[in-house]
Amino acid sequence: MLKFGIQNGLNVARAGYSEDQILTACMLADRTGYDSIFYMDHTNVPQWKNAIVLDPWVMLSAIAAVTNHVELGTCVTDAIRRHPSNIALAAITLDRVSKGRAILGIGAGEAQNLKEFCIPFEKPVSKWEEQIQVIKKLYGSTPDNLSLIHI
């Protein structure tokens, strides 16, 4: 079956929609049968000056409070910039407040979100793989016996 979702991010930032307008659009998507809403996880949008960039986990929690059916996910959380324990806690919290509707979208990141903060963009795939290991362990409540290089 074909599913429909909306990505609530780059276009929203560029267009300068207010938080209330974003929430209204998400409520409408929920009521009209959309399957999912994804929110970008960027620190900036350099190609668009004065873009409004909000934390995806906070916005997805706000969206969860005003919707009932749509799944909610990050598009995508950066495994270099965010610590795995923070990612796990944010995803678990969103899943609980949304009553099981959270989707964790996680990737290796990109340089544009790191260079402004002097975070090196080195070995992103290796760091991402380690993040996944840690998050899986945290979900299982057994964060011991990990052999990590980058965290």
What is the meaning of each model-derived region?
Residues 32, 66-70, 134, 138-142:
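A structural motif corresponding to the C-terminal end of an alpha-helix
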Residues 23, 57, 81-84, 88:
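Glycine-rich phosphate-binding loop at the start of an alpha helix
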Residues 2, 83-149:
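Internal, glycine-rich beta/alpha segment that forms the wall or movable "lid"
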Residues 30-31, 61-68, 91-101:
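Acidic (Asp/Glu)-rich catalytic clusters
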Residues 46-51, 77-83, 120-121:
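Glycine-rich "substrate-gating" loop/helix at the edge of Rossmann-like oxidoreductase active sites
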Residues 3-7, 36, 69-76, 101-105:
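Structural preference for beta-strand elements that scaffold enzyme active sites
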Residues 9-13, 42, 77-79, 107-111:
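Active-site beta-loop-alpha junctions enriched in small/polar residues
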Residues 1-66, 149-150:
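N-terminal beta1-alpha1-beta2 module of alpha/beta enzyme domains
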